[in-house]
Amino acid sequence: MIQQETRLKVADNSGAREVLTIKVLGGSGRKTANIGDIIVCTVKNATPGGVVKKGDVVKAVVVRTKSGVRREDGSYIKFDENACVIIRDDKGPRGTRIFGPVARELREGNFMKIVSLAPEVL
């Protein structure tokens, strides 16, 4: 679960390497985000010449969490790191590539472009 002040790795080539969560979107007083939820972040570490710069405030969707998520069939899926993909207002990714696997739960959130760019969907 991702909450305020959580640092996440960025799993795309938008130029950001690490972001810090400012707010979890979706309802008043919502405290935590899981896979497929949208968060507002600030860029803490970025590569030179990237689309996003250090200090930019961006929206991102969570694609991997250490705490994992329970599926309808009773199975759990967990990852080794917390990671997100920076998105535009139309839910499309800012970058052109996605690194690492993403969870199948992103299909339900209408993030089909991210799912299609990902090398592996678990």
Curated annotation (Swiss-Prot):
Pfam families: Ribosomal_L14 (PF00238). Part of the 50S ribosomal subunit. Forms a cluster with proteins L3 and L19. In the 70S ribosome, L14 and L19 interact and together make contacts with the 16S rRNA in bridges B5 and B8. GO terms for molecular function: large ribosomal subunit rRNA binding; structural constituent of ribosome. It comes from Staphylococcus epidermidis (strain ATCC 35984 / DSM 28319 / BCRC 17069 / CCUG 31568 / BM 3577 / RP62A). Transmembrane segments: none annotated. Keywords: Ribonucleoprotein, Ribosomal protein, RNA-binding, rRNA-binding. This is Large ribosomal subunit protein uL14. One of its GO terms (cellular component) is cytosolic large ribosomal subunit. Gene3D superfamilies: Ribosomal protein L14. Binds to 23S rRNA. Forms part of two intersubunit bridges in the 70S ribosome. Belongs to the universal ribosomal protein uL14 family.
